[in-house]
Amino acid sequence: MDRTINVILKPLRRFAIQKPNASLLLFAATIVAMVLANSPWADRYHQLLAFPIDLQAGQFNFFAHHGETMSMLAFVNDALMAVFFFVIGLEIKQEVLIGELSSVRKALLPIIAACGGMIVPVLFYMLVCNTPPEVNGAAIPMATDIAFALAVLGLLGKRVPLSMRIFLTALAVVDDIGGIIIIALFYSGHIAFEPLLISLIVLALLYVGGKFRVHNRLFFYIGGFIVWLLFLESGIHPTIAGVLIAFTVPARPVVKLDDFTCDMTGYLNMLDYTEVRQSRKAEVLTPTQIQVLNNIHTLADKTISPLQTIADKLHPLVNYVILPLFAFVNAGVTFGDIQPQTLVNVPLAVFVGLFVGKTLGIFSFSYLFACTPFASMPTGMSKRNLFGVSMLGGIGFTVALFIANLSFDGSTAAGADLLNQAKLGVFTGSFISGLCGYLVLKWVLPKEKVETI
């Protein structure tokens, strides 16, 4: 099965090597969805979203929830987005173990910044919408889309200090943790304890397996799929399963890099002293050479931790398939259904939460905390730089759309209308935040390349 997965992912990895801009692909999918939703093909578009997804073994349908087959929309949001959150979980674990969240001193400022970027947007949203059912969307402007935010920062090139990229990345990671907690606490349904208990047992087995150096990726793929199925049946949102599974994946390789280097020296010497049979038309290796090369391949594979190997394999799938597909099925705002009087309701609340709430929350919490003895401003960052980065934090998009789908029930007419309004707020808030953040940073950053870290 691991080979099958590699065969599926190999073309995507080759595509990713060319380094196409994943954010542009995401943006293109969004535009296509919006055009289709407001065109003569709108009915076809919505029929596609309702298309049933089946995967059956005998009488058991893997993609059924409470006896109902998943639609394309549900499959993307509940199944494929679990893979996205799995990769997010791997990145969070890496940051906690060895990255910007690995020590209290390094983590404090982005944690405080992220807290401001979650609390203040919710307050601004509730200033505009504070009655049911509109208030259900209060968590929508909490999210920061790290891919889009870093893409906008990347437009400024080498003028951006490395410390600024690190700060924004760490802030977004903490933001993701907050979003995951919110989804787990407030967007899960009635909990069925039997499948939940079984899923926790499977998670424990995955964790113990990792501790006992079971590094077979198939072990985590199969175990993870079982946990996802059980979470689906338990009533807890299945994307949470992706994060929890990620935390069980080992971050230590079987072979340390120093040992790999020593062993490689011996293997290369063995190859040097073995003749190659070759002609103009062919080159034939000896059994010894084949064995040595296979040993090198195995050794190299064991020198990369399962956490990094799995993340590396799944990143192309997430960036070039799952996220564009998510945007395509969720970004279809029907403008004709939006009445002028509703613009001051959910759309305004989400817009203000993202553009004003995120900016003020991140900037004020960060700046005030940096004035205390417990933290300082990152090297190369000024107040003006921080203000520009805070604006980029208002680019919500992916996770904001995801929370919007959880906040409002699109299967009812009233819920679909509110969801449509929320999507409009996400698009406008994210776009204005990105544009203003870019313009501010373009103005305040040094004109020459910076060397600070």
From Swiss-Prot:
Transmembrane region(s): 22-42, 72-92, 108-128, 137-157, 166-186, 189-209, 218-238, 316-336, 343-363, 386-406, 424-444
An example Gene Ontology CC term for this record: plasma membrane
Domain of life the protein comes from: Bacteria
The family this protein is said to belong to: Belongs to the NhaA Na(+)/H(+) (TC 2.A.33) antiporter family.
Annotated catalysed reactions: Na(+)(in) + 2 H(+)(out) = Na(+)(out) + 2 H(+)(in)
Stored InterPro entries: Na/H_antiporter_dom_sf, NhaA
Record-level GO BP terms: regulation of pH
HAMAP family: NhaA
One Pfam match: Na_H_antiport_1
Localization per Swiss-Prot or TrEMBL: Cell inner membrane
Entry keywords, A to Z: Antiport, Cell inner membrane, Cell membrane, Ion transport, Membrane, Sodium, Sodium transport, Transmembrane, Transmembrane helix, Transport
Claim: Metal-binding is one of the keywords in the record: no
Protein name: Na(+)/H(+) antiporter NhaA
Origin organism lineage: Bacteria, Pseudomonadati, Bacteroidota, Bacteroidia, Bacteroidales
Membrane topology label: Multi-pass membrane protein
GO MF annotation list: sodium:proton antiporter activity
